[in-house]
């Protein structure tokens, strides 16, 4: 594996994981809110 590939993929993977984490957190919050209302 080339160093350049690692340098490109690492921040990309971190950004992707952070986005997925935030979207999941928001989805759970929204689901809890609608669940408690109903």
Swiss-Prot record:
Membrane side Lumenal: residue ranges = 1-4
A GO term (biological process) for this protein? photosynthesis
Query: Does the keyword field hold Transmembrane?
Result: yes
Spell out the molecular function terms from Gene Ontology: manganese ion binding
Transmembrane stretches, start-end: 5-23
Which InterPro entries does the record cross-reference, listed alphabetically? Answer: PSII_PsbY (IPR009388)
What's its membrane topology?
Single-pass membrane protein
What UniProt keywords are attached to this protein's entry? Cyanelle, Membrane, Photosynthesis, Photosystem II, Plastid, Thylakoid, Transmembrane, Transmembrane helix
Q: Where in the cell is the protein located?
A: Plastid, Cyanelle thylakoid membrane
Task: Describe the function of this protein.
Answer: Loosely associated component of the core of photosystem II (PSII), it is not always seen in crystals. PSII is a light-driven water plastoquinone oxidoreductase, using light energy to abstract electrons from H(2)O, generating a proton gradient subsequently used for ATP formation.
Q: What protein name does the entry list?
A: Photosystem II reaction center protein Y
What organism does this protein naturally occur in? Cyanophora paradoxa
Encoding gene, per UniProt annotation: psbY
């Amino acid at each position: 594996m080339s160093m350049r590939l690692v340098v490109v993929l690492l921040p990309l993977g971190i950004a992707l994981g952070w986005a997925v984490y935030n979207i999941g957190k928001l989805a759970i919050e929204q689901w809890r809110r609608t669940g408690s209302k109903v």
